[in-house]
Swiss-Prot record:
It comes from Nostoc sp. (strain PCC 7120 / SAG 25.82 / UTEX 2576). Gene3D superfamilies: NusB-like (1.10.940.10). Keywords: RNA-binding, Transcription, Transcription antitermination, Transcription regulation. CDD domains: Terminator_NusB. The lineage of its organism: Bacteria, Bacillati, Cyanobacteriota, Cyanophyceae, Nostocales. Belongs to the NusB family. This is Transcription antitermination protein NusB. InterPro entries: NusB-like_sf (IPR035926), NusB_fam (IPR011605), NusB_RsmB_TIM44 (IPR006027).
Amino acid sequence: MQDRKPQQIARELALLSLSQLPLNPKKLTEEHLPKLVLATVRTLRAEVQDTLDNAAAELQRSNDRLLTSQTRASDLNTARNMLQEAISYTQTAINQLGASVEFPELIQLANQDKEVGRYAIKLVKIINEERSVIDEQITSALVDWQVTRLAQIDRDILRIAVAEMMFFNLPNSVAINEAVELAKRYSGDEGHRFINGVLRRVSDQKKALSV
């Protein structure tokens, strides 16, 4: 793991924790964070296994179609599309697995630096308490799409970035760059480009309102 600033580690912990929140996030304390992250590790491992299984199934389907298809263009195109889907599944699994092997060190760093825990908890609380406002901002920047239809990991990355823009006074460019880096680690192959595009529209809208 490359050396990272406390807020970068906290941001990652917050991302991983959003899907593991207790019923009442307001009761979340620094003492609860390690347990929250450990629960997240177990969930991510299960997701990685599911993704690997899906990738294996898609690769097998692609291989079968390539072996059995005729030379007709439609069959070859179908086989090619299936193979591309399989590659996408595999890439997502590799990204998730690569991130999960760093969790032990991530937890250790979080335990050593109190700022990490405080910032992660603050992020999670703000996102929970201001979710409707944050989601409204995201929705306004989506093109023919809804927040609820986004993949959970992409939705949570966007929420973290918008929360930092709106409530932490983090410069828009910094929030966008940090979100893109998170997307490269946890989202699909094209996830970081999608995240970048949405957040740049959010930034443009905020600038327009401030004029």
